[in-house]
């Protein structure tokens, strides 16, 4: 499967959700979708990012937008993460990295001199027709969610 590109339709994909149901991208047509990728459940930055999406969830819903998070954590880990922080949205368990590879977010990282492959914190805005309209890579957690939803007020999104 080819990688997503801004301005192009996102290919249909399926993935395992936290509730062990299957997320089907094709079933989300008709509403905007924010997909955010984060490295790991229950870590400080990832928790803060999830809390920011949670705290802005009602604003996003009013803009006809659904939120979904993605990491390589298991569905069981996601269930605990959601319960602990009261997230009103689902998380995709991408242990096989298929969704991560589709969105090209697996990158070489460096921690304390040790190189490894991991998720680069990234967010993607997909319009109601399934077209990728904006991507943010190497995201800084603070203030990122507000920047994400300001793009939803652009005429190209609101007129869809």
Which stretches of residues belong to each language-model region?
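N-proximal helix/coil linker or "cap" segments that precede and/or mark the start of modular domains
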Residues: 1-12
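Short loop/turn microsegments at loop-to-beta-strand junctions
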Residues: 10-11, 32-33, 120-122
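A short beta-strand-turn-helix
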Residues: 14-32
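Short active-site neighborhood of thiol/selenol oxidoreductases, capturing the structured segment around
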Residues: 28-44
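Conserved small/polar residues in nucleotide/adenosyl-binding loops
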Residues: 43, 150-156
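Structural microenvironment flanking redox-active thiols in thiol-disulfide oxidoreductases
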Residues: 47-90
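Short, internal strand/loop/helix patches
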Residues: 68, 79-120
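Thiol-/selenol-based redox modules, centered on thioredoxin-like
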Residues: 120-152
């Amino acid at each position: 499967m080819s990688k997503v590109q801004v301005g192009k339709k996102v290919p249909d994909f399926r993935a395992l959700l936290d509730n062990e149901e299957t997320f089907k991208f094709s079933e989300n047509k008709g509403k905007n979708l924010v997909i955010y990728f984060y490295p790991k459940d229950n870590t400080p930055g990832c928790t803060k990012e999830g809390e920011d999406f949670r705290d802005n969830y009602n604003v996003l819903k009013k803009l006809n937008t659904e939120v979904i998070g993605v990491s390589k954590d298991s569905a069981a880990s996601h269930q605990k993460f959601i319960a602990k922080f009261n997230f009103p949205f689902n998380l995709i368990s991408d242990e096989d990295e298929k969704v991560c590879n589709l969105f090209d977010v697996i990158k070489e990282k460096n921690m304390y001199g040790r190189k490894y492959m991991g998720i680069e914190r990234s967010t993607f805005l997909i319009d109601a027709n399934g077209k990728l309209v904006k991507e943010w890579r190497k995201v800084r957690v603070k203030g990122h969610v507000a920047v994400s939803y300001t793009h939803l007020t652009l005429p190209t999104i609101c007129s869809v």
